[in-house]
Every structure is written in structure tokens, then in C-alpha cells.
């Protein structure tokens, strides 16, 4: 019973937001979970639509379970937003796959960027450039 999850704001939810979950179902996921910011989104802005409307739309669109990302993570930086969401999904103990969409659509390019950001050499290479104002 593979479970796929997505981390989102859905402010508001639109068809494109559902594509990663639909792709996961086509790859064998039998259940889907979404963790979504509540009535406030990143940068502390109020959500366009109330939380309840976004949950109803997600459930109506086929998402099996919608969880609310705790407020301190929802209004935080992208790094803390993602960390809080991943920790929450991990605590469920049933999520097998984390799915996402991207504007570029190039998984290989995203993997290269991720590898570069995780490189132990990055801080040493970045520090002199930042110090020079680059």
C-alpha cells in the first residue's frame, strides 16, 4: 500500500498542483497525503482562501489525507517550511514517497543543483565570493 506525499501551500489549489500526486498514483501509489500551510502562508501573508476551502478542494480532487503544517513552519523560510513538513510527514510512519513539481521539469538539472548544494566543498568555495560582494 504505497503512500505518496506532497508539501504545498495551495494558495489557491489549482490543477497543476495535483499533477505530482496523479503521477505518483500512475507509478503505483495507492494513497496520497498532503501537508499544507493553514490560514497563513510563507512570509506570514494570509492565505487567499481559508484552510477549510483548500482542504475540501484537495479532498474533492482525490487527495486522501490533508494535514495542516504547524504555523511556525508555515510562516518561516523555505528551509524551515520544508524541514517542518518533512518531519511531520516522517512522523506519520507511512509515507513511502515524497513527490513534487517544478517549473523547469528537468529532474537531472534539479539533482545536479541538489548535489552542488550538499557538497562539502560549497562553504569553502562560496565564502570568498560572498566576501568579495559577488
Model feature map: region roles:
Residues 1-134:
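Nucleotidyltransferase catalytic core that binds NTPs
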Amino acid at each position: 500500500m504505497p503512500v505518496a506525499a506532497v508539501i504545498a501551500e495551495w494558495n489557491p489549489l489549482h490543477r497543476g498542483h495535483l499533477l505530482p500526486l496523479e503521477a505518483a498514483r500512475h507509478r503505483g501509489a495507492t494513497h496520497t497525503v498532503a501537508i499544507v500551510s493553514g490560514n497563513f502562508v510563507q512570509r506570514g501573508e494570509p492565505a487567499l482562501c481559508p484552510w477549510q476551502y483548500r482542504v475540501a478542494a484537495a479532498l474533492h480532487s482525490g487527495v486522501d489525507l490533508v494535514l495542516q503544517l504547524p504555523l511556525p513552519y508555515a510562516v518561516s523560510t523555505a528551509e524551515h517550511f520544508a524541514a517542518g513538513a518533512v518531519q511531520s510527514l516522517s512522523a506519520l510512519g507511512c509515507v513511502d514517497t515524497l513527490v513534487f513539481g517544478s517549473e523547469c521539469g528537468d529532474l537531472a538539472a534539479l539533482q545536479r543543483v541538489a548535489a552542488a548544494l550538499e557538497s562539502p566543498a560549497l562553504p569553502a568555495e562560496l565564502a570568498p565570493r560572498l566576501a568579495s560582494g559577488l
